Swiss-Prot record:
It comes from the Bacteria. Belongs to the Fe(2+)-trafficking protein family. Signal peptide: none annotated. Keywords: Iron. InterPro entries: Fe_traffick_prot_YggX (IPR007457), Fe_traffick_prot_YggX_sf (IPR036766). GO terms for biological process: cellular response to oxidative stress. This is Probable Fe(2+)-trafficking protein. The keyword Iron applies. One of its GO terms (molecular function) is iron ion binding. Could be a mediator in iron transactions between iron acquisition and iron-requiring processes, such as synthesis and/or repair of Fe-S clusters in biosynthetic enzymes.
């Protein structure tokens, strides 16, 4: 049976994640309030941020930056602006 959540990002009831994306309170909050679709969108946005800003997942500053951006993206009710250097491939 598919688990449904009232997704805060998409503002509708959608299929939820299968498990919290990481441990702790924030992971549980995401599990309870974010759909698979919204999480997929965040992962795409995160990839752009990592590539455009040349972030290292081992750098604590980069980890904090991504965590803040994730919270804005998922719970802030706003889409994030793309980095200035970003050029979408058509």
């Amino acid at each position: 049976m598919t688990r449904m959540v009232n997704c805060v990002k998409m503002e509708q009831e959608l299929e939820g994640l299968d498990f919290p994306p990481f441990p702790g309170d924030l992971g549980q909050k995401i599990y309870e309030n974010v759909s698979k679709e919204a999480w997929k969108q965040w992962l795409a946005q995160q990839t752009i941020l990592i590539n455009e800003y040349r972030l290292s997942s081992l750098d604590p500053k980069a980890q904090n930056f991504l965590k803040e951006e994730m919270q804005k993206f998922l719970f802030g009710g706003e889409d994030l602006e793309m980095p200035e250097e970003f050029q979408a491939i058509d």
